[in-house]
């Protein structure tokens, strides 16, 4: 449970841009303060991929088979398929989720791996050529490599906000609120953004940031790009459970392939048991 914040202790909230103050995940903004934000995009190695990448369909390109990485978490992975299909990432229609799962199953044979933080090592070394990831982290890789490019796919993408909250059980709530207030100071927010790589929800902080960062389309995408984003919301339990089941099927190869695997295991065990029983029976005859 999260504590309701006392904003008398957070006067610097006034520097947070208005568009961040009434989020879907915290109506009225009573329990959280926006800390950073970003989008999801694709980064790719131009040493191996010469054509310009513009859309999520690149993650299904057989020319890159064995060199494609994919998110190892269901919400982000499904979202990519949903953007390709023109769906809402918050759809309540189970048929939509099943269609997205089918698309992910089509992709699986050409993937190198489902990964998260390992993306950095694999992309830097050239072991992988293309991968989706969060813009703030991707920017670091782009800055450190002349051959890595980043793009926000034209079909749209996820917009996310990291927020600061205080547990209702906190015994130092006032001190925590004062710390949040410190982080909301524009100069501190600007320095923090330069360090962590994720965009600050404070326009006033840009005055204290490197000009290259402020003008970077990775850190601060255009209004046109931002208008084509969607924000995740919590889904009903029945939908969440179905997503978990579908994700397991995607990772395991689908219900049909899972059934084959189970049949093979059962067959192996049957043969093993038969051999054991035969040996026991043979030993009894020899002793007799």
Predicted regions: what they are:
Residues 1-4, 26-29, 140-152, 212-217:
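Ligand-binding "clamshell"
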Residues 223-288:
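Conserved C-terminal helix/tail region of periplasmic/extracytoplasmic solute-binding proteins
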Residues 167-227:
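Mature extracytoplasmic/periplasmic domains
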Residues 1-127:
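Extracytoplasmic ligand-binding site segments that recognize negatively charged/polar headgroups
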Residues 56, 119-122, 138, 176, ...:
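Short, hydrophobic alpha-helical packing/hinge segments within bilobed ligand-binding/sensory domains
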Residues 124, 130-147:
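A ligand-binding cleft/hinge motif common to bilobed small-molecule-binding domains
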């Amino acid at each position: 449970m999260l504590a309701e914040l006392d904003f008398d202790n957070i006067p610097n909230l006034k520097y947070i841009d208005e568009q961040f103050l009434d989020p879907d995940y915290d109506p009225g903004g009573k329990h959280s303060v926006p800390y950073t934000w970003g989008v999801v995009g694709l980064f790719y190695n131009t040493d191996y991929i010469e054509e310009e990448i513009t859309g999520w369909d690149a993650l299904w390109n057989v020319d890159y088979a064995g060199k494609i990485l994919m998110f190892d978490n269901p919400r982000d992975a499904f979202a990519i398929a949903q953007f390709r299909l023109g769906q809402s990432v918050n759809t309540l229609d189970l048929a939509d989720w099943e269609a997205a799962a089918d698309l992910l199953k089509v992709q699986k044979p050409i993937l190198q791996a489902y990964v998260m933080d390992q993306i950095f090592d694999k992309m830097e070394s050239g072991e992988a050529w293309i991968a989706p990831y969060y813009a703030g982290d991707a920017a670091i890789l782009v800055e450190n490599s002349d051959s890595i490019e980043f793009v926000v796919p034209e079909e749209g993408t996820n917009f996310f906000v990291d927020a600061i909250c205080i547990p209702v059980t906190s015994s130092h709530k006032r001190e925590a609120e004062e710390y949040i207030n410190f982080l909301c100071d524009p100069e501190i927010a600007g320095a923090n953004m330069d360090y962590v790589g994720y965009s600050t929800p404070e326009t006033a902080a840009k005055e204290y940031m490197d000009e290259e960062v402020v003008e970077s389309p990775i850190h601060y995408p255009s209004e046109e790009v931002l208008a084509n984003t969607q924000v995740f919301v919590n889904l009903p339990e029945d939908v969440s459970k179905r997503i978990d089941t579908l994700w397991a099927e995607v990772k395991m190869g689908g219900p049909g392939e899972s059934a084959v695997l189970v049949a093979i295991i059962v067959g192996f065990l049957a043969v093993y048991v038969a051999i054991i029983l035969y040996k026991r029976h043979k030993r009894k005859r020899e002793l007799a």
